[in-house]
A protein has these predicted regions:
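Beta-strand-rich domains and repeat architectures in extracellular enzymes and scaffolds
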Residues: 33-62
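Hydrophobic strand positions within the blades of repeat-based beta-sheet folds
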Residues: 53, 68-69, 104, 117, ...
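Short glycine/acidic-enriched loop and turn motifs that connect beta-strands
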Residues: 58-62, 171-175, 227-230, 277-283, ...
Length: 429
């Protein structure tokens, strides 16, 4: 049984570019003292104070690898890249790889103070150390019950006991389920305990998982989204259940992307849901309407505000990235606009956080990144960069957006300038 979504406030606002953001009297944003409590920094694998760019990629089924690009005061430094291949990661040839660039999970699973890598749907672990993951690093495997698992588990403390847990989705025709593996983890990869939740979505779905604190209680909450058959669902953490997640999920407004952030600077977590109306498989024509952004602020839980953005059929809301892009202490929200999910077109509108009511209703910054001649043997140009992640890769206390497309990476604060950009390692020429 699911809880019906409550939409108490509904407003439709057309989003148009805005050159300046007027300061709001009494704004809760505090430059140098962010209202949020979660770290901005991208995962710092080698402990040098700068976060690394970490991603999985496979140009072909046999080419599965994890790429680690070290961070610096100028952003990722491609000349110091480490590439871990399938053999070094301990991923067997039988494990299915994916075609798209993907994020492995980075988390301290054993509590030794070093970040570890969890890669592939087979949940292989490369244990961290003072110099980060290396080809000769100790390895393990998290035992996942049943099969198959096509995407890497996500990490967060779902039961609030101070140890990071992993959550995975089992794509099984007979018994699809959310699987929660409790920390701390042994060096073999074995969890302290395991619990299963029967799938809350359609059995044919391949949902995405997002762990984050949606309600400010310090326990990680789970968003299950990007199912063409179901609305996004929220399972709150810290529950008195075997898994630590709530027994009944909360239905969120319809949409395909979810982000958590503190957009009004009040110290409470807010939820954003993007609804582009673009068919997930590009089989049907997009209806002649604007995309939507649904927002629920922590100060008014259960109350949703809806804004429309972009022009009709532009796909406003395809992907969302939350982060403080100007260092004022409030999270902002980058919204990707994509006309076709399988096409290489993408533009962005950044909504500024910290106004009297939270996110501004007009874009603060609009931008796109395009490569006219993509690198690699199969890409055809031009290709736009799509959202990969939002984090602080240069240690300046402000988040950057990482975009990837056509073998190119861009790191930007949403303006026309890049803090860093480079061709993907191994694809130049």
């Amino acid at each position: 049984v699911t809880v019906p979504v409550a939409v108490a406030v509904l407003a439709y606002l057309a989003l148009l570019p805005s050159e300046e953001v007027a300061p709001v009297p009494g704004s809760p944003c505090r430059a140098g003292g962010p209202a949020r409590t979660d770290p901005l920094l991208a995962p710092d694998l080698d402990g040098d104070g700068f976060g690394e760019l970490v991603y999985e990629e496979s140009a072909d089924p046999d080419g599965f690898q994890v790429v680690v690009v070290p961070g610096s005061a100028r952003g990722p430094v491609v000349g110091r890249t480490t590439v871990l291949n399938r053999e070094e990661l301990g991923v067997p040839d039988s494990v299915q790889s994916i075609d798209d660039t993907w994020r492995p999970t980075v988390a301290d699973l054993d509590g030794d103070g070093h970040l570890d890598l969890v890669v592939s749907g087979d949940a292989r672990v490369v244990w961290g150390g003072p110099d980060g993951p290396r080809a000769d690093s100790p390895r393990g495997r998290v035992p996942l019950p049943g099969a198959p698992y096509h995407t890497v588990p996500v990490a967060g403390d779902v039961d609030g006991d101070g140890h990071l847990d992993l959550v995975a989705y089992r794509f099984s025709a007979k018994n699809p389920a959310l699987v929660v593996l409790k920390g701390p983890f042994q060096r073999s990869g074995a969890p302290a305990d395991t619990a299963e939740i029967p799938t809350p979505v359609n059995e044919a779905a391949f949902p995405a998982l997002l762990l984050g604190d949606a309600n400010g209680d310090r326990a990680a909450d789970l968003a299950v989204y990007d199912s063409p058959y179901d609305p996004p669902l929220l399972l709150t953490g810290g529950a008195d259940t075997p898994s630590g997640l709530s027994a009944e999920p909360e239905r969120l407004p319809a949409g395909e992307s979810v982000a958590f952030g503190d957009f009004d600077g009040d110290g409470r977590r807010d939820i954003a849901v993007g609804q582009s109306f673009v068919d997930p498989y590009d089989d049907e024509e997009t209806p002649y309407r604007r995309g939507r952004l649904h927002l629920a602020y922590g100060k008014e839980p259960g109350t949703w505000v809806t804004m429309e953005g972009g022009a009709p059929q532009e796909g406003f809301g395809t992907w969302l990235g939350a982060g403080d892009f100007d260092g004022d202490g409030c999270d902002d929200l980058a919204v990707q606009l994509t006309r076709k999910k399988e096409a290489a077109d993408a533009r962005f509108a950044v909504l500024h956080g910290g106004s009297e009511h939270g996110l501004a209703s007009e874009p603060w910054r609009t931008f796109r990144r395009t490569v006219a001649e993509p690198s690699g043997p199969v890409d055809e140009g031009p290709v736009d960069g799509s959202l990969f992640a939002a984090a602080d890769w240069d240690g300046d206390g402000q988040a950057e957006l990482a975009l990837f497309g056509g073998g190119h990476w861009w790191f930007t604060d949403g303006t026309d300038r890049d803090k860093a950009s480079f061709v993907e390692p191994g694809r130049a020429g």
